[in-house]
């Protein structure tokens, strides 16, 4: 059963989402050559403290930091460190999640380190793939319609689809049903209902979609070292479509 949120619950998640959006905006100003990923983590930690929220990632199944910082071939779950220093031309995914008054919000964005007019197509295409998926959220449609839309767009642009990680339900827990892969057939599974909250998050690569996990048991990289981008929104189903919460 996929839970239906009350207006009060949605407002709490919306507030958490607003803080995440502000965190992304703040961190984006520090995504420049010479910044360490540990500095980004420290900035996020301080920002969370100032806004009376807690990281959803810190100590989650043992994850050691407050945010995920995934650079270049790192697909997801990159651990911030003083050893990872951003360079001109890098791409970095910042994945944020917070807990606020019993509810979670989660969102991710891939950034280019350098002149934004030179942003690689992979980044803009992955963001577009996310939005293509979200356009499927309307009364009568199925969760698998999101999956099919993302898959179709990625295939049209010859991008690898990482299949090992999926979107997910969210609310009183960070990850819950439904799980929303970025591939599949349309018109299958659960149907959207007003008040459902979940995250959609395509992870696409310039090469192989195959991944491996490094010895830290967290960092996920493409096996062929190709670049990977990742975008994520937390959304709520409305009576006619959807609203982005984070």
Please describe what each predicted stretch is.
Residues 1-246:
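Active-site neighborhoods and metal-handling regions in enzymes and metal-associated proteins
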């Amino acid at each position: 059963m996929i839970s239906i949120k009350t207006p009060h619950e949605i407002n709490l998640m919306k507030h958490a989402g607003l803080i995440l959006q502000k965190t992304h905006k703040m961190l984006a100003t520090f995504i420049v050559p010479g910044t360490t990923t540990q500095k980004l983590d420290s900035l996020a930690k301080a920002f969370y403290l100032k806004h009376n929220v807690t990281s959803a990632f810190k100590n989650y199944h043992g994850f050691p930091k407050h945010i995920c910082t995934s650079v270049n071939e790192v697909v997801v779950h990159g651990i911030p460190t003083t050893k990872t220093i951003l360079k001109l031309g890098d791409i970095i995914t910042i994945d944020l999640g917070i807990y606020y008054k019993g509810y979670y919000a989660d969102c991710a964005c891939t950034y280019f380190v350098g002149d934004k007019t030179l942003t690689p197509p992979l980044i803009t295409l992955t963001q577009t793939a996310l939005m293509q998926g979200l356009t499927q959220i309307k009364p009568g449609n199925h969760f698998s319609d999101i999956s099919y839309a993302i898959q179709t767009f990625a295939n049209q642009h010859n991008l690898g689809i990482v299949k090992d990680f999926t979107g997910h339900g969210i609310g009183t827990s960070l990850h819950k049903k439904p799980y929303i892969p970025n591939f599949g057939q349309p018109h299958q599974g659960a149907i959207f209902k007003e008040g459902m909250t979940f995250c959609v998050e395509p992870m696409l690569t310039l090469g192989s979609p195959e991944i491996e996990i490094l010895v830290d048991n967290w960092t996920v990289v493409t096996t062929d070292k190709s670049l990977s981008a990742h975008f994520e929104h937390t959304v709520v189903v409305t009576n006619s479509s959807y609203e982005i919460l984070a």
